[in-house]
Amino acid sequence: MRYLFFIFFCVYQQLCFSQAIANIGVNLPSVALLDVEPKGEIIRLKFDNPSEAGKALQNSESSDIKWLNFTSALPLGSSRHISVQITSERLSSGYEIILETSGFTGVGAGILGNSVPLVNLSNSPVRIIDNIGGAFTGDGLNNGYKLKFSLIINDYSLLKGESNVYAIIFTLTDN
């Protein structure tokens, strides 16, 4: 009896159930997108005049904060980094522009890299985020890496009373 039941079950399964196989191809392109938010606003750094003769110039606290957003998709085992540099004329003598990069904040996910907290900007690229893998930071303000710029006087004898505008470029590069 068991034998008949087993045969009946096997025949029933073949008649009532069927399977088919479909192959699905997935193509994930390499993606490297980088954005600075908010767009179009100039970062204004300045020194305030001292209130009394004999006092040093004061670095005016900048309220201009930028956010660095990125999306990265790359082959397994690969990584990327983000560098920054001044691409316009050479930085005037007597002061330095310092970039402070926070740790990651926001809604993103993946291998978001490690920030280098403080760098001096120059005409040569300087890494600010290393070891980026497949990741996204989220878009807009309060997502990604917070960027804060400041000025430091390094030689009073070289300072000139002038105004300059510097172009700063951020680059997302494969390692």
Please place each PLM-identified region on the residue numbering:
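Surface-exposed loop/turn segments flanking beta-strands in extracellular/periplasmic regions
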Residues: 107-119
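Bacterial Sec-dependent N-terminal signal peptides
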Residues: 1-23
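Extracellular beta-sheet repeat scaffolds used for adhesion and glycan interaction
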Residues: 120-126
